[in-house]
């Protein structure tokens, strides 16, 4: 096997998804701790330590203790090269999370043991199901009082429609949490103090057959309960089948506490053994194989002003095939231009490392002078194919945006367009108006705060937001067949265009959508756009 193929085969690229506050960012931190990428894990809430989490780099994230942008983190562990796509956990950021899932080969789903399957978990799971990627479950916060373990598994199966297979089993919860039982090794693993999770800690392993030592370690009552549960589990749970896991039909489940490091490294090791190396990707010419094809990639995220001093803009690309070399020329398919990618770098939070090479599965950031859009394909100059586009999902909240100081119009237009190109917001214009009348659409209302904050802090522009009553927006799929001037809807319907010139319709409620379809026979409306 060539070094080139070996490099691709040792890549594991995955996203971490969860409902808000399930512990996703904390788990990410602990992965980095075990990988040696950081020496001290920062508490997201800032209670045990004043450190900020490495993956929460933007000022607004540090202030609020939530992730609002998707970070890309890479580290080495046990011979693997791991790329974590740390997605926003707040419920307002599902569209950015969706785009990030397009760049992942698998997903780690974090569930709070005291709450079970929550609303955001269902939504994100559905997105993973659409792509058919494997899902690995980490049931977190066993250091707090948890729901019954069998009930948690039953809830995952019923709510999400996926079979579960526990890889390990928790011993107690809350103050009685002793550790985990590893089903494969048939041993109980207990942990020493980890200084509130900021250090790795050391593990004690005892075979479950050694009842005397087991009772000494976890107590007689806990030992009896564990032995009973293991017997029940071995007879009742689904058999492990790796092919079912990789098809997204069976989720391996691990239990632990990211905050105190219980079960984290066990989960990481099992995940790396089961998850796939980069897989072939669908393009308009067919499947593109990671190892057999030369370099290709697609843009899944754009972030402006990552370095405030330099007013820069970075396009994040997922390499899908081949090897990237910093000196090579590549084709930007949508722009039909051959170019060298400027300042290729690996970015861990706000720290950067210039790259000379990267492989399929890796995420690289490149300087973007404003030519890239989300979903763009890059490949070798002799090739010309496009990866499937990333859908634009319908926003659910709308506001009219006005600048407070008309003398700063240039900064206002630049700022709002850059933030829109990153995919954080969508901007629309009413028919026959200019940029002075902008309607902003967001998936969640917190993005309005982010927009206001970023315009003030990065572009020195103050804005006023006027909330609008619209809750539904639809793209006109057959726009070439529709006379927009003659299109009639309800009195509350508004016609707008997106920044690409596509016509859309805004509605106050679902009834208005239905009435408009009834009044305009042949009209085809869509909840998302690929154009």
Cite the ranges covered by each PLM segment:
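Structural and coupling elements of P-loop NTPases
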Residues: 1-531
């Amino acid at each position: 096997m060539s070094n080139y193929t070996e490099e691709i085969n040792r890549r594991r690229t995955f996203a971490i998804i969860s409902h808000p506050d399930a512990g996703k960012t904390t788990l990410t931190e602990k992965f980095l701790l075990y990988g040696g990428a950081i020496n001290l894990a920062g508490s997201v809430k800032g209670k045990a330590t004043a450190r900020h989490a490495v993956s929460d780099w933007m000022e607004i994230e540090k202030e609020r203790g939530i992730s609002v942008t998707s970070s890309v983190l890479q580290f080495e562990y046990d011979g693997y090269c791991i790329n974590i796509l740390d997605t926003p956990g707040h419920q307002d950021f599902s569209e950015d999370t969706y785009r990030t899932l397009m760049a992942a080969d698998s997903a780690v789903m974090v569930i709070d043991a005291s709450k079970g399957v929550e609303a955001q978990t269902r939504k994100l799971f559905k997105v993973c199901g659409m792509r058919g990627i494997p899902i690995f479950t980490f049931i977190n916060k066993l250091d707090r009082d948890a729901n019954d373990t069998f009930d948690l598994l039953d809830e995952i199966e019923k709510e999400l429609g996926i079979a579960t297979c526990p890889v390990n089993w928790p011993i107690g919860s809350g103050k009685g949490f002793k550790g985990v039982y590893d089903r494969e090794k048939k041993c109980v693993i207990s942990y020493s103090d980890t200084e509130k999770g900021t250090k790795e800690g050391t593990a004690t392993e005892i075979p479950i057959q050694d009842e005397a030592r087991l009772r000494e370690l976890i107590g007689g009552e806990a030992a009896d309960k564990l032995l009973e549960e293991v017997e029940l589990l071995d007879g009742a749970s689904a058999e492990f089948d790796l092919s079912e896991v990789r098809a997204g039909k069976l989720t391996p489940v691990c239990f632990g506490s990211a905050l105190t490091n219980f079960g984290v490294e066990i989960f990481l090791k099992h995940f790396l053994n089961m998850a796939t190396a980069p897989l072939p990707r669908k393009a308009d010419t067919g499947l593109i194989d990671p190892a057999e094809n030369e370099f290709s990639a697609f843009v899944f995220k754009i972030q402006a002003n990552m370095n405030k001093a330099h007013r820069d803009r970075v396009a994040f690309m997922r390499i899908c095939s081949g090897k990237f070399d910093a000196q090579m020329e590549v084709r930007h398919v949508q722009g039909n231009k051959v170019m060298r990618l400027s300042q290729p770098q690996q970015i861990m939070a706000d720290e950067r490392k210039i790259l000379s090479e990267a492989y399929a599965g890796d995420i690289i950031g490149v300087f973007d002078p404003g030519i890239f859009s989300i979903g763009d394909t890059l490949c070798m100059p002799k090739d010309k194919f496009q990866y499937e586009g990333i859908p634009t999902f319908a926003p659910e909240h709308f506001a009219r945006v006005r600048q407070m100081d008309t003398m700063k119009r240039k900064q206002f237009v630049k700022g709002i367009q850059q933030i829109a190109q990153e995919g954080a917001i969508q901007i629309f214009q009413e028919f026959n108006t200019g940029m002075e009348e902008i309607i902003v659409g967001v998936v969640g209302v917190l993005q309005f705060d982010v927009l206001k904050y970023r315009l003030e802090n990065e572009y020195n522009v103050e804005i006023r937001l006027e909330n609008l009553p619209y809750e539904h927006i639809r793209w006109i799929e057959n726009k070439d067949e529709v006379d927009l001037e003659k299109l009639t809807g309800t009195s509350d319907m508004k016609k707008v265009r997106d920044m690409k010139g596509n016509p859309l319709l805004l509605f106050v409620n679902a009834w208005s959508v239905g009435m408009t379809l009834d009044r305009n026979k042949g009209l085809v409306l869509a909840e998302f756009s690929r154009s």
